[in-house]
Amino acid sequence: MTDISIPAGDDGSFSAYVAKPAGGGPAPGLVVIQEIFGVNQVMRDLCDAFAAQGWLAVCPDLFWRQEPGVQITDKTQEEWNRAFALMNGMDQDKRWTTSRPPCRGCARIRIAPAKRVGRLLLGRRLAFMMAARSDSDANVSYYGVGLDGLVGEAASITKPLLMHIAEKDQFVPAEAREKVLAAVKGNPNVTAHVYPGVDHAFARAGGAHFEPEAAELANGRTAAFFKQHLG
């Protein structure tokens, strides 16, 4: 478990936390996209948990152009304010390109010779964008904030996408949720689950809206999904 540096290909390099499975042999690569709090302990623990299941987990720092090395929590209003400022100040297209190098080259960054690569997004829109725009083998989206602005790309999703949506998400109005579900309905590559009665970040261990039963169900589905599509 370590931090590495990855060339961005445009204007520098960024760090990423890497958790490798035991044994050191080939393993499917999993790019874990951070929440708005940076590559903090929650994200590192999540990567470690995936590595324990046999995945090569990489969590890139998406805030590196603004403020490298952000690690904050969701425990105070000041931290929330800082997190939202970072998120709102980010160039979404560059955020997308930052997530591509780890996905394209888990072998190239000399961690391990990855066989297949997937993405897990804890937060907003990136997994949906990657499913529509990239060559990653499988993508998982938690919570789905802002997806209603991407429904025009739903028909472009040709790789497996699993979506976990909170019914009572304070950041996703019911109208927006239904718009997204209608857009992906009928696409055989998309599986969407709505979790009744839970709020945003219901799967964030230790978070204010953590719901153990819903989290266990969602995380179990995620593990099975990646096992099916990444091997």
Swiss-Prot record:
Pfam families: DLH (PF01738). The active site is at D169, H200. SUPFAM superfamilies: alpha/beta-Hydrolases. The keyword Hydrolase applies. The keyword Hydrolase applies. GO terms for molecular function: carboxymethylenebutenolidase activity. Signal peptide: none annotated. Keywords: Hydrolase. This is Putative carboxymethylenebutenolidase. InterPro entries: AB_hydrolase_fold (IPR029058), Dienelactn_hydro (IPR002925), Dienelactone_hydrolase-like (IPR051049). Its EC number is 3.1.1.45. It comes from the Bacteria. It catalyses: 2-(5-oxo-2,5-dihydrofuran-2-ylidene)acetate + H2O = 4-oxohex-2-enedioate + H(+). Belongs to the dienelactone hydrolase family.
